[in-house]
């Protein structure tokens, strides 16, 4: 329709969403979560991370209004998705996929 969309491949290089302009500073109502795509993780033990667990193999919508998505890798692959979730609105403000050998930050 309108042109090529920014779609992250399920296999390939990782790319982080957001930057200094969209990064939220830690504060009341904000908490950093992380989980790996390979099996259970620490986030699974956090009650507030239930939504993230449900989204673990689905596109994740960042709450910065950009409408961009980051796609998780296939089950069994090595990668980590970092999400800063606003506990008040239950929306993520940053997400970043890290693959083996790739470094990145939200």
From Swiss-Prot:
The keyword Secreted does not apply. Changing residue 81 to A: Enhances FOXO1 nuclear translocation but does not abolish inhibition of FOXO1 transcriptional activity in the absence of forskolin. Changing residue 78 to A: Abolishes inhibition of FOXO1 transcriptional activity. Expressed in adipocytes. Expressed in brown and white adipose tissue but not in liver. Protein levels in brown and white adipose tissues decrease following fasting (at protein level). Expressed in white and brown adipose tissues. Expressed in adipocytes. Not expressed in liver, skeletal muscle and brain. Signal peptide: none annotated. The keyword Cell membrane does not apply. Induction: Up-regulated during adipocyte differentiation. Up-regulated by starved state in white (WAT) and brown (BAT) adipose tissues. Down-regulated during fasting in WAT and BAT. Up-regulated during cold exposure in BAT. Keywords: Cytoplasm, Nucleus, Phosphoprotein, Repressor, Transcription, Transcription regulation, Transferase. One of its GO terms (biological process) is cellular response to starvation. Residues 1-44 are annotated as: Disordered. Its EC number is 2.3.1.-. Disruption phenotype: Mice are glucose intolerant and insulin resistant, despite being leaner than wild-type mice. It is found in: Cytoplasm, Cytosol; Nucleus. A motif (Nuclear export signal) lies at residues 78-87. GO terms for molecular function: acetyltransferase activity; chromatin binding. Regulator of adipocytes that acts by repressing FOXO1 transcriptional activity. Acts by promoting acetylation of FOXO1, both by preventing the interaction between FOXO1 and SIRT1 deacetylase, and by mediating acetyltransferase activity in vitro. Regulates insulin sensitivity and energy metabolism. This is Foxo1-corepressor. It comes from Mus musculus (Mouse).
């Amino acid at each position: 329709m309108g042109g090529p969309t920014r779609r992250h491949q399920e296999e390939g290089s990782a790319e982080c969403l957001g930057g200094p302009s969209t990064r939220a500073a830690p504060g009341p109502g904000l908490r950093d979560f992380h989980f790996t795509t390979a099996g259970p993780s620490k986030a699974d033990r956090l009650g507030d991370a239930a939504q993230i667990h449900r989204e673990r193999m689905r596109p994740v919508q960042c709450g910065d209004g950009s409408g961009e998505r980051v796609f998780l890798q296939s089950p069994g692959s090595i990668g980590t998705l970092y999400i800063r979730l606003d506990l008040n609105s239950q929306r993520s403000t940053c997400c970043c996929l890290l693959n083996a050998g790739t470094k990145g930050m939200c």
